[in-house]
Amino acid sequence: DLITNSYTRGKPRHVTSWRNLKTRDVCDSLVEGRCIHNGCQCDRSAPHGNCCDTDGCTSLWWCPKTKWD
């Protein structure tokens, strides 16, 4: 029960945090199609999967380097 309750309690916080980060995702053509997610710069041609699509960043972003702006 303790494990289940802890997992259930932690889940809403994780979802809320993800949505907050998601709103700051941007797929910027000005940086060669790179996707910037919460200070993390992502390449569309990354081997780990696409970073950008028409809706912005996907959950499969890969970060070769960080960018703080």
UniProtKB/Swiss-Prot annotation:
Any one Gene Ontology molecular-function term assigned to this protein's record: toxin activity
Primary localization: secreted
GO-annotated cellular components: extracellular region
Tissue expression from the record: Expressed by the venom duct.
Keywords: Disulfide bond, Neurotoxin, Secreted, Toxin
Proregion residues excised on maturation: 1-23
Subcellular location, record wording: Secreted
Disulphide bonds in the chain: none
Post-translational modification: Contains 4 disulfide bonds.
Domain notes: The cysteine framework is XII (C-C-C-C-CC-C-C).
Protein name: Conotoxin Cal12.1p4
Organism: Californiconus californicus (California cone)
